[in-house]
Amino acid sequence: MTANLTHLQRLEAESIHIMRGVAANFSKPVMLYSIGKDSSVLLHLAMKAFYPAKPPFPFLHVDTTWKFREMIEFRDRMAAELGFDLLVHINEEGVRDGINPFDHGSNVHTHIMKTVALRQALDKYGFDAAFGGARRDEEKSRAKERVFSFRTASHTWDPKNQRPEMWKIYNTRVAQGESIRVFPLSNWTELDIWQYILQEGIPIVPLYFAKKRPVVNRGGMTIMVDDDRMKLLPGETVEERMVRFRTLGCYPLTGAIDSCAATLEDIVSEMLTARTSERQGRLIDRDEAGSMEKKKREGYF
C-alpha cells in the first residue's frame, strides 16, 4: 500500500504515526510552537492526526518578547481560529533583569530567554514529551539527533548516549523526571516543507513572503527594523528593500534575504536552486564553533 504513496504522503504518514505514538505512550505531551513554517506544518499534521477531535495536548510558545510583531499576531489568530490549547511562557526573571539581544548579546539572550525559559515551562507543567519542529537537514547537530531524543531530569542532551532507532522502532521509556524531545519532521527537508505547505494550503506568517521592508546591514546580515527598540550602530542607516525570511526568530537576531518570491510557488522555485541552509540567517548559530550543539546539550529546542 505504501508503494502507491507520493514522497510527501510518506513523510506525512510517518509524522502522523509518530504523533499518535507519543499520544498513546506518554502521560503529558506538549507541542512546542515557535510560529515558523515548521511549526505551522506540525500544527497542520497534529490537526490531521487526531481529526475530528482536537490534538490531545497543548501547544507551548516560549516568548522571548523579541519576536517579530507579525509572528505574535499570527500565533494569536491561529489559536483563535483553530481553538487549540495555547500556553505562552516568558522568563519573567529575565524580563526583570532587562535581558535583551543588544546589550547582552545573542548567546546570553538566547540562553536565558529561550533555553532557561523552556526548561522553566517544562518543569512548571510536568511535560514528559515535547514535540519540536527540528529537521536533520538544517544543521549538523540536528542531523545526528534521534527522532525520539532522550533528556535527563535537568533537560540536558548527551549526543554520545542516544538510543537506537532501527526499523523505526522508538524507545519511549523514561524514569521519573526524565523526558523525551520528539521530532516528527526529522526526515523532511526545507523543500519538502514548502512543497507540503503549497499542497495543503497551510497558513504561514507573512514574513516568509517578499515585500519592501525597513532593514539595516549589520555584520553581513540584513536585519529588519521591527519596532522602536532597534538600536542602530554608528554609521547604520535604515533602507527599504525587497526581502523575505527563510527562518524566523527574535527579530534582531534573524537575517532576511533579498528576494522577489511573493507567492508559495515563487518560494518553491527559489528553494529548488538554494545552496545554503536557512540557518545561515540565524545569528545565534554564529556565536561560536559548535554553537547549536552546545545549546542543545543545555536544553535548547
From Swiss-Prot:
An MF annotation (GO) of this entry: ATP binding
UniProt keyword Repeat present: no
Cystine crosslinks: none
Domain of life assignment: Bacteria
Alphabetized Pfam families for the sequence: PAPS_reduct
SUPFAM superfamilies listed in its UniProt record: Adenine nucleotide alpha hydrolases-like
One of the GO BP terms on file: hydrogen sulfide biosynthetic process
Pathway(s) per entry: Sulfur metabolism; hydrogen sulfide biosynthesis; sulfite from sulfate: step 1/3
CDD domains membership: Sulfate_adenylyltransferase_2 (cd23946)
Keywords assigned by UniProt, alphabetized: ATP-binding, Nucleotide-binding, Nucleotidyltransferase, Transferase
Entry annotated with the keyword Phosphoprotein: no
Catalytic activity: sulfate + ATP + H(+) = adenosine 5'-phosphosulfate + diphosphate
Region spans: Disordered: 282-301
InterPro entries linked: PAPS_reduct_dom, Rossmann-like_a/b/a_fold, SO4_adenylTrfase_ssu, Sulfate_adenylyltrnsfr_sub2
E.C. number: 2.7.7.4
HAMAP family xref list: Sulf_adenylyltr_sub2
Annotated function: With CysN forms the ATP sulfurylase (ATPS) that catalyzes the adenylation of sulfate producing adenosine 5'-phosphosulfate (APS) and diphosphate, the first enzymatic step in sulfur assimilation pathway. APS synthesis involves the formation of a high-energy phosphoric-sulfuric acid anhydride bond driven by GTP hydrolysis by CysN coupled to ATP hydrolysis by CysD.
Subunit structure of this chain's protein: Heterodimer composed of CysD, the smaller subunit, and CysN.
Annotated family: Belongs to the PAPS reductase family. CysD subfamily.
Protein name per its UniProtKB record: Sulfate adenylyltransferase subunit 2
Native source organism of the sequence: Chelativorans sp. (strain BNC1)
Gene name, Swiss-Prot/TrEMBL: cysD
